[in-house]
Amino acid sequence: MVEIQSQNEHHKFWANHLLPQFRRYIAEIGAYTSKQQDEHVKFFDSLLPHLGPRLPHPHTKAVLTVANMPLGFSVNLSDARKPIARMEIEPLDDTSGSAEDLFAANCIPACFTTLVKGMTTRVDTRWAHQLRQAFTPTSEESAIAKPRLRPGIERVSLAYFGITFDGDNRAMKYCTSHWPKFLGTATAESNDATSADAFLFSAIRRLKPGGEALAPSLDAIQHYFQNERHAKLPSPILFVGLDCIDPSRARIKMYGRTHSTAFSNVRNIMTLGGRALTAETTEFLARLRSIWHLLLNDPKAKDDEDYDRPPLDPNSLRTGLLVSFEVSALVSTPDIKVYVPFWQYHETDVQAINNLEQIFSLLGWDWGSGKYGDLLRKTFVGTDLAATQNHDYVSFNYSKRQGSYMTMYHVPPRPESTTA
């Protein structure tokens, strides 16, 4: 086991809380050798300075997770391969959210540098840096954008990073939002959802090299948005993520939110209003339909495709479903996924575990026999899972190549004390 040397009180604060949890998490997943675990833990430790000062932050809250933690874990299960651990991080520093750095832009370059240095696969950041340059507002634009944010939103993050741990390998994804730049530059007449989407799509089409190859999928999404004018539409797009690999292979995901959980609405979105219905999509929808009531924790959703499950917290901005539209130069139609905010439909981790283990058993995975519950119990030691909710989102997908695959996103409990 490697020994981690904390660099300062803030690093020590995060290390004491998160390092043991991350080590247990990747160990319990069961897909990594001891050497691989040690290497990933050392890399994880190198990221902790980018989480910002010890809690409470003097100026802002992390917006990556519903619990305002700047970091999350996730596990991906699949028919086709071993489980894969992932993590997501929102970089912050001690001035993030202050008057001098309203949208926490100043800390992003340093985090980029640490991440690129820690990857074991080839990294290509050309597209990422182009979007960062396009969407980072000036201080003047930030001052204009801040009061234009939707009521209840304190800050929109300009950067999330996702890291995948696949055996020895680590690969990274960059996420950003166009909203601060858009709100800081839009006129009163053009400050609307349609204009915001157009601003984003235009920036993606201009990416070099290869942005023009994304046109067929982008056209299909924009056509859907323009022809499906209803309140359930997952528009406007909220943020965008992309793989930091060669642009000829990179995926770009655009995330929006629909406030309806009715499966009829999911079908409409997944098929772009019926325009993108294929044999693969039909199989995907059939599999998703068979477990939808378990994802929503409501038997009413089993037989009624129009049933819209009420959220546990209707006042939250994170209601309904998160939807991603994935485009790449390799395909001419977008790949669409839905993400269920489990904390909105499961009061506790125990409820979530019970439903997910039923799903895993239906899918023929050995994670349905108590293994998944053990992952959380052994990771979050001392946490009463019958009284907590450490689940964030859960996604399900299907493809001919990978079969069924799911990702469960987890939020580490917030430190109970701000002492190191």
From Swiss-Prot:
Q: Where does L-tryptophan bind?
A: 65-66
The record, for InterPro entries, names: Aro_prenylTrfase_DMATS
Enzyme class name: transferase
Any Gene Ontology biological process: alkaloid metabolic process
Which pathway does the UniProt entry assign to this protein? Secondary metabolite biosynthesis
**Residues reported in the UniProt entry to bind substrate:** 86, 251, 253, 255, 339
Q: Transferase: present as a keyword of the record?
A: yes
Q: Which GO terms describe its molecular function?
A: transferase activity, transferring alkyl or aryl (other than methyl) groups
NCBIfam families from the entry? arom_pren_DMATS
According to its UniProt entry, the function of this protein is described as: Tryptophan dimethylallyltransferase; part of the hps1-dma1 gene cluster that probably mediates the biosynthesis a derivative of cyclopiazonic acid (CPA). The hybrid polyketide synthase-nonribosomal peptide synthetase (PKS-NRPS) nps1 might incorporates acetyl-CoA, malonyl-CoA, and tryptophan (Trp) and utilizes a C-terminal redox-incompetent reductase domain to make and release the tryptophan tetramic acid, cyclo-acetoacetyl-L-tryptophan (c-AATrp), as the first intermediate in the pathway.
Protein name according to UniProt: Tryptophan dimethylallyltransferase dma1
Organism annotation? Dothistroma septosporum (strain NZE10 / CBS 128990) (Red band needle blight fungus)
